[in-house]
């Protein structure tokens, strides 16, 4: 008697899109996240880029637990539009810029695990914004990946984002974005509505 052994096809792991956790710690953090997301989304309309907010970034194929959820991430050289989550190996691009809306309670994770992870992934710039000024006196600070054998972040001292071609500055509980080529401020939705009246 011959016995056939049938092997089952490999099972693709499930990559969840949600974790059941709140989007942000406080209203100020949520507002800063949503405004940053929308301002950058509008700024990059027509570009080969996407801006995602509080969605899982999967960085190791086959290991769905190896993930993080940046508050805002900008990825260039990909199809524009939303996604339920972002898998680096499917898209072929690492985020160029990541923003974390940080607080005293997320400080250690934002300064430790996330900063190290983003360095290792090759994220060009990492910005931390503390809308309540709980631990970053100047509220906003950025780090740029250095072109060295070992990926390392160095502080951005001029407030300029090279990938975005914008100057960033803290403006109360939001980040102000200014074009490097014209100096023009990118308007938030409320400012845009007033300007259109």
Where are the language model's segments positioned?
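A structured, charge-rich N-terminal accessory region that forms the first stable segment of a protein
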Residues: 25, 29-40, 48-50
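A structural signal for short, well-ordered beta-strand segments and their strand-loop junctions
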Residues: 51-52, 127-130
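Generic preference for hydrophobic
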Residues: 51, 72-74
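Short acidic/polar active-site loop segments enriched in Thr and Asp
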Residues: 124
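C-terminal interaction segment
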Residues: 1-25, 38-39, 57-70, 77-97, ...
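A short acidic/basic microdomain associated with nuclease active sites
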Residues: 47-60
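Short, solvent-exposed loop/edge-beta patches enriched in aromatic
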Residues: 43-48, 66
